[in-house]
Amino acid sequence: MEYLRFILYGLIQGLTEFLPISSTAHLKVISIFLGIDDPGPSLSATIQLGSVLAIVWYFRNDIFNFRGQSSKKILYYFLHERLLRSIFIGTIPIVLLGGSVKLFVPNFLDNVLRSNLSIALVSIVMAFFMYLADSSKRGSIDIKNHNYSDSFLIGFFQALAIFPGVSRSGITISSALISGWERRDAAKFSFLLGMPAISLAAIVEFIFSFNEFFSIGFLPLLVGLITTFLSSLLAI
């Protein structure tokens, strides 16, 4: 039964992470509907690593494309590659906001903002924001010609995804569309921007909730991680 629960968590997480819907909200709703435990922020952040692995695999040619770079050292490539710099800049807001909330008001985030009412209200606001984005004029900005200010702005909206009910992919894609991005590249940048954000969230939760992970056990977490990876590949 324990493994089936983690398989369910992984399926929900993987299928909803890359759709403009909140994976946290769906995990919460289905947990209530089935009468099982809410995975909580720690477990949710951990199984999200499966989504990161799926992004790395799907965009492996973009991430590990060193063709034509043979005369340069890999470190130089990473420091000067425009896309990687954009991802770094876009990650700054969620590090600052997420770190501040986790350090100074962790109980407010975990208890108040994860309430059913709070998630429902945030989801309604999120739906309205996505409607505005979908109704906005189609733009021509893409990954190759965007500014670093675009990266920071999208990263700012990504930081709001620490609040349950906000879809990380939904709010980043929507903010990019409103800013004038082309739809396909908006989605692509959103997925790539999620890699460091999701990874850092999992690391922070592991540090702050080590005892919880230890009590769950390695195998159930691994099952959830693998399930998330496979379902994320289907969703991408």
Question: What residues fall within each predicted segment?
Answer:
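Multi-pass membrane proteins that catalyze or facilitate reactions on polyprenyl-/lipid-phosphate substrates
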Residues: 1-236
